[in-house]
């Protein structure tokens, strides 16, 4: 094999690798300003962040529609969609529970639906070259819906309700 043939072969393998990477995970290309469509609703990517759990990482995109704020996340090949909810609508109250016990309850209830604890741990939240420690509690209902709690300190707690998305549910990705 001649020199030029080796160069062509080398570049064609590199192009195949890039194409595989792009096709295997289209969310990885999302960046601030991109437009996506989920369930017939148009959303704009307004920010990108990373959760570092030590053994794994989760990439997150903050998205906004005309009237709602949501988050897409990608963790271990799975896509999740979350919307912020009021943590005071959860039972037991997560702030009171955290201050009293320092650990998650086994169950939380939101609007009459019960969610069981699936994960409790710490992560490093990384955004705009800054990082912040956060405690994460993840709960799941029998039908797969999720409640995630992010505890920044004993008085700053954020709650999110979400579900796993299939790739086809993201109907379009329009780069900025």
Curated annotation (Swiss-Prot):
Entry protein name: Uncharacterized protein aq_1347
InterPro entries in the cross-refs: DUF4178 (IPR025235)
Listed Pfam families: DUF4178 (PF13785)
Source species, domain of life: Bacteria
């Amino acid at each position: 094999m001649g020199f030029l043939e080796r160069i062509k072969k080398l570049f064609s393998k590199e192009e195949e690798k890039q194409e595989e990477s792009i096709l295997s995970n289209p969310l990885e290309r999302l960046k601030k300003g991109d437009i996506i469509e989920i369930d017939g609703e148009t959303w704009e990517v307004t920010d990108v962040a990373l959760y570092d759990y030590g053994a794994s990482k989760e990439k997150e995109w903050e998205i906004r529609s005309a009237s709602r704020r949501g988050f897409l996340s990608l963790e271990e090949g799975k896509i999740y969609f979350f919307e912020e909810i009021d943590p005071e609508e959860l039972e037991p109250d997560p702030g009171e529970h955290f201050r009293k016990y320092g650990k998650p309850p086994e169950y939380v209830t939101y609007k009459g639906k019960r969610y069981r604890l699936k994960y409790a741990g710490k992560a490093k939240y990384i955004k705009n070259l800054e990082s912040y420690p956060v405690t994460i509690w993840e709960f799941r209902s029998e039908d797969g819906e999720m409640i995630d709690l992010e505890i920044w300190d004993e008085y700053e707690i954020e709650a999110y309700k979400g579900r796993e998305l299939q790739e086809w549910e993201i109907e379009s990705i329009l780069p900025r």
